Amino acid sequence: MPNVVIDANTVASAALKAESTPETALLLALLYDAMYLSEPVLAEIREVLGRPKFRRYLGPDRITEIMALILADAHLVTPITVVRACRDPDDDKYLDLALAADAYAIVTGDHDLLSMSPWRGIRMMNAAEYVALIAAREQLPG
């Protein structure tokens, strides 16, 4: 099963809108790939989902549902490499994680990460590109 990293903003977008492209990407990652997390990425997901601006749209049940889904199937790794390659240093944790997980892709909407693709053989793609890739690879009905 190929390894993939999904960033916190994609997870937040999935939580905010059921049946959206980001939610489909998250579900496909959990079903057809091995999704990887690190403690810093998990902390960012929790922080983003807990932001006050999302509280009016995200109830505690939805946050619990998304976190349970991720924690049930995602793999937790501790990166040993510390990378300083992204324009936004806060995004380097995703590069660290992708290297530790031997991921083929990072699913993100972040322009700083997307502009790096490919980086050390790792593709950066948005949720729609990832959904299309998995649909083609797994020959899923359109």
For the regions a language model picked out, list residue spans one by one.
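Short, well-structured N-terminal submotif of metal-dependent ribonuclease cores
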Residues: 1-37
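Acidic, PIN/NYN-like endoribonuclease modules and their adjacent C-terminal/linker elements
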Residues: 88, 104, 111-142
